[in-house]
Structure formats: structure tokens, C-alpha cells
Amino acid sequence: MIPGEILTDDGEHELNAGRPTLTVVVANTGDRPVQVGSHYHFFEANDALSFDRAAARGFRLNIAAGTAVRFEPGQTRTVELVELAGERAVYGFQGKVMGPL
């Protein structure tokens, strides 16, 4: 076993089962690619990304941990977000929340 490795049963595994999700359309209005990681508070993502930020407050991408989604310049894509869990407090990132949601 490798430190940090997770051994799972064979078959498919549903991530974030039963958690509230939100689907948003995101457009990269900038001239450079933007990549957003799996656990980044999507509300605070790069300002070049155009989407309903108010709706995305308290959500992150609904993708596997350690992965990311890349938005190319001029690209529009639909992504699914999942509600943040735990204490529902956000610190850091762009400093737009700095406390409970």
C-alpha cells in the first residue's frame, strides 16, 4: 500500500451521493486558459469566468478529488457543482467569504 492510497471494491462508485448539486453554464471571457481544481470554492473562481456567481456560493466542482476542469479562452461549457460539506465555512481563495456561508 502507498501512503494515502485508498483501496476500493471493484465496480462503479458514486461520488457525493445524496449531496445537493447545481448545474451552471460557464464562459471563459478571458484570453488565457483558466483551470479550476476539484475543491476550489467555485464562487471565487477566476473573474474571467462568467457564470451565476451568486448561485455558486458554497459550491465546488462535482469531480473527483485532485482533478480539475480547464476552460479555454472563448469556451463555454456546462459543469455540475456540488454543495460544500463539513462546517460550511470558507477561508482563503480570493478572500471573498472568509467565514461561514
Swiss-Prot record:
**What molecular function terms (GO) are annotated for this protein?**
urease activity
Subunit structure, as described in the record: Heterotrimer of UreA (gamma), UreB (beta) and UreC (alpha) subunits. Three heterotrimers associate to form the active enzyme.
Lineage top rank: taxon: Bacteria
Pathway membership: Nitrogen metabolism; urea degradation; CO(2) and NH(3) from urea (urease route): step 1/1
Q: Which family does it belong to?
A: Belongs to the urease beta subunit family.
Question: Chief subcellular site?
Answer: cytoplasm
UniProt source species: Burkholderia ambifaria (strain MC40-6)
Q: Name one GO biological process term.
A: urea catabolic process
Q: Which NCBIfam families match?
A: PRK13203.1, urease_beta
The EC designation for this entry is 3.5.1.5
Show the Pfam families listed in the entry.
Urease_beta (PF00699)
Can you cite an annotated GO cellular component?
urease complex
Localized where?
Cytoplasm
Q: State the protein's name.
A: Urease subunit beta
Q: Which reaction does it catalyse?
A: urea + 2 H2O + H(+) = hydrogencarbonate + 2 NH4(+)
Q: Which UniProt keywords apply?
A: Cytoplasm, Hydrolase
